[in-house]
Design a protein with these regions (language model features):
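Transmembrane alpha-helix termini and helix-breaking/packing motifs in multi-pass membrane transporters
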Residues: 32, 36, 146-167, 241-252, ...
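Helix-loop boundary and gating motifs at the non-cytosolic
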Residues: 2-57, 217-265
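Conserved MFS/SLC helix-loop-helix module at the cytosolic interface between two early adjacent transmembrane helices
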Residues: 56-94
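Helix-loop junctions on the cytosolic side of multi-pass membrane transporters
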Residues: 167, 172-194, 399-410
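Primarily marks hydrophobic transmembrane alpha-helices of the MFS/SLC 12-helix fold
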Residues: 76, 292-295
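Juxtamembrane intracellular "pre-TM" segments in multi-pass secondary transporters
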Residues: 1-6, 181-222
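Cytoplasmic helix-loop-helix junction between adjacent transmembrane helices
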Residues: 103-143
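C-terminal ends and interior cores of transmembrane alpha-helices
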Residues: 81-95, 300-313
Length: 410
């Protein structure tokens, strides 16, 4: 008799915990690793991110189609294994070329997970309020990130390559465990009449395109995601350089100064957990009507805090603005995802979510080199200011999404 698999919601929370732990462990000091071990300059740092986002952009929709046509569970498993291989490659071979190649590998892995995971849990737990599911998953992921940050920072004090390599090995082991326990009981292919791989891809893509065109709220939300992509790569790639070049890191006891980057990530995770709890309580009390205000406030907060982060030079002020910018971005994402989920048909969830991820990547592909060149030719603070301004159009798109969603519901 085969052993009964755990409930999907429990596996989803386990996934968010374990994967966040491993991802944080691998990436908490990755910028420092790229700067101090691989020896990258500001433009190369941004190019690493651009290659990663290009891989995500190229593979995002095809992998979403795979998830909707074949299996969302299988798509998630492939993604976890690719992450493991990518981390091993990046940590083992500290050269610019292999770091770029590693971004392609684990960037492709990310596209297999993005969209498929959200579509899988939304189908398996049909009827549950997805705002709470996604926020609770994000909250647990933030808690796991704390452990990952601690482990990654301690291991990085020994050797900056060690946490990346170990995370890669553990990703492979987690993939094996996940293959045994992850259920998939409510999946039905988006296309019943199959005509071959290429024709199926084309048919589902056209079907999704017609669906999105007929849903103005989805168009607005997808454009908001695109603006978020434009405004994220510069923050991700230049904030570490800003701390190292434009301020003095205080001593951190017996540990070296790079420990501050682990501590910043730790603080960000704690704040993310607390903010998610506040949002869950607000959504339970006020319902989905509060989404518009949440997305508007967090978007405006990100713009203001990032500009203040860019112009500051005192460490404690920079730390406060850095944490605020990261916090607003963290709590904004799951609310937008749940908002989008309410307007997507079940059979097309993974592909629409993947399109959302692709637009995020496309935004980063465009925004990354722009802010990288500004940082290289003028200064890093000006690159960060440029990053913040790229999110401004989303402030005009949020009311459009709210109005369109209201009309569609009526």
């Amino acid at each position: 008799m085969s052993q009964k698999k755990p409930r999907a919601y429990s596996v989803y929370l386990l996934f968010r915990f374990c994967f966040s732990l491993l991802f944080s462990m691998a990436t908490v000091l990755s910028m420092v690793y790229h700067l101090k071990v691989v020896g990258l300059n500001s433009l190369q740092l941004v190019l690493v991110g651009t290659v990663l986002e290009t891989a995500c952009f190229v593979f995002e929709v095809p992998t979403g189609v795979v998830a909707d046509l074949y299996s969302r569970r299988r798509s998630v498993l492939i993604g976890v294994f690719l992450y493991g291989v990518g981390f091993l490659m990046e940590g083992s071979l500290p050269w610019f070329g292999t770091v770029l190649l590693a971004q392609v590998v684990w960037g492709c892995g990310d596209t297999f997970i993005t969209g498929a995971l959200e579509a899988w849990i939304a189908s398996e737990e049909e009827g549950k309020p997805m705002d709470k599911v996604f926020l609770r998953g994000g909250q647990l992921g933030q808690a796991a990130s704390i452990l990952g940050v601690i482990l990654g920072t301690l291991l990085g004090n020994v050797n900056l390559q060690l946490p990346i390599v170990l995370a890669g090995l553990l990703c492979l082991a987690f993939g094996v465990i996940l293959a045994r326990i992850m259920p998939e009981t409510r999946f039905s292919p988006a296309l019943e009449d199959r005509k071959g791989l290429i024709k199926d891809f084309a048919s589902l893509f056209r079907l999704n395109l017609r669906f999105v065109k007929g849903a103005p709220v989805l168009l607005a939300l997808l454009l908001i995601t695109f603006c978020g992509g434009l405004a994220s790569e510069g923050f991700d790639r230049l904030s570490t350089v800003h701390f190292l070049n434009d301020t003095v890191l205080p001593d951190f006891g017996p540990l070296n100064s790079v420990t501050w980057f682990g501590f910043m990530s730790l603080l960000g995770s704690v704040l993310g957990i607390l903010a998610s709890e506040v949002l869950i309580a607000r959504l339970e009390k006020q319902g989905i009507s509060s989404r518009t205000g949440i997305v508007m406030v967090t978007s405006a907060g990100y713009i203001v805090s990032l500009i203040l982060f860019a112009v500051g030079n005192h460490f404690w002020f920079l730390l406060a603005m850095f944490l605020l910018a990261g916090l607003t971005r963290t709590v904004r994402t799951p609310v937008i995802t749940a908002w989008m989920n309410d307007h997507v048909e079940e059979k097309m969830r993974a592909t629409v979510f993947s399109t959302n991820g692709q637009l995020d990547s496309f935004g980063q592909i465009i925004g990354g080199p722009i802010v990288g060149l500004v940082a290289q030719q003028i200064s890093v603070p000006w690159g960060l200011i440029c990053t913040a301004l790229l999110l401004v159009p989303s402030l005009f798109l949020i009311p459009i999404a709210a109005k369109s969603g209201h009309h569609q519901s009526n």
